[in-house]
Amino acid sequence: LPRAAFEAAVAIGPLFGKLTDAVARDTEWLHKTLEAAGQGDEFTERLLEISRTVNKEGLGQQLQLGILRSDYMLHKPTEAEQKLPLFTEQAGADTGPKQFMQVELNCIASSFGCMGHLTSQLHQYLLSRYPAESAALSAALSNGADGVAPNHNLARLPKGIAAAHSAYVQQGGSPDAVVVFVVQDGEANSVDQRLLE
């Protein structure tokens, strides 16, 4: 992934977070928009039922913490797409990847954030341990193993959860309140989630 593309994805992350928060708070629009998806997917329908019930009863807690993972791909336009104004304005002489496309916005994403930390460390290790085997990649990164972006989620996600707990207590919530992790039976990612403990 080119550094400029990675930095663009990092920069846009907070904007996607704000957009997601605004969408989540517009429950009437959200329910209407996802109605057809719920009819075709039992899990989505159950989430919509929970949301409708909570919305009807009224939120008892105004504080919310969203741990989101947004997955992107770089799209290299076809020749036909390159002729469209969107691409010709951006492209110049470069015919490489032109735009990010969001593949998924995962709202149940606490565990994989921590896995990203470990993946970053793995990439740094492999590049430093086997430089000859990864010469092309090291050249693309320009700084070899030092060019791999660090990932601090293993520290940041638990700090975010702790900050949400602290804010809850400061707003009058019970100081004995606990953070509960709900893990479904047979969850394949339970080991990943334990990184947050």
Placement of each model-derived feature along the sequence:
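Preference for protein termini
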Residues: 1-197
